[in-house]
Amino acid sequence: MSKKISALSAGSLVKLNENGVAKKYIMLGYNHYGKAEVTLLRKDAVGNRAYNACQNGYNVYNGNSLDSFCNEQHIQCLDPIIRACLVNVPIPTTDGHVNGTWSATVRNLMRKCFSLSAAEVGNGGSDGTAFSYLSTQANRIAYQDETTTAVYWWLRSPNSGYNNDAYFVSTDGSVDYDNVYRGYYCARPALALSSEILVSDSADSSGCYTIASAPAGEEYQKVNGVWMRMC
């Protein structure tokens, strides 16, 4: 038996393969961005990277190091059937500082994979709506991949007071801000996926639901546990 992924409650765990290795994602909600999508947040953080490794004093998310990693690099490690089910959604994003000048304008960037905003983790602001699951500090804590070591992870929100700074979630789940070139903070990608994906009817022994089938399933076949595109 299987059921729609949209039927899962917030906080449920779903396994997605990254380069053929199962990783855990947290169900955050359904239709949050108005595209009939489900939003999944990676349970663990991914490596260390700067918010903006190229330009100090430039805390703009659009096209920066963090944005490029999420929407270009991270997507490529997912199984092809999951990539085919990604949904472009409008993520509210504050412009930030450009060459020292602050712009509070919030624009909707179209993204399939992205970093959450300070507003979306319950810290207030105009760049998004909070996910209820992330309203408590404990639920915001992320760990280095497959470890019990809590890490700092970047949000996409720039800080208005300092052109060098952007917001992040600390190891205790609180929200703070720091310099955009800090390379020892982590990315924690969120995915927007089709709500038509079917998952297992119950969680497995690790407490996770697994992908049973997907809208693009007619193009793919599972070979040795990995989804492969059939020509």
Task: Identify the residue ranges that each predicted region occupies.
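Collagenous Gly-X-Y triple-helix signature in extracellular proteins
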Residues: 1-231
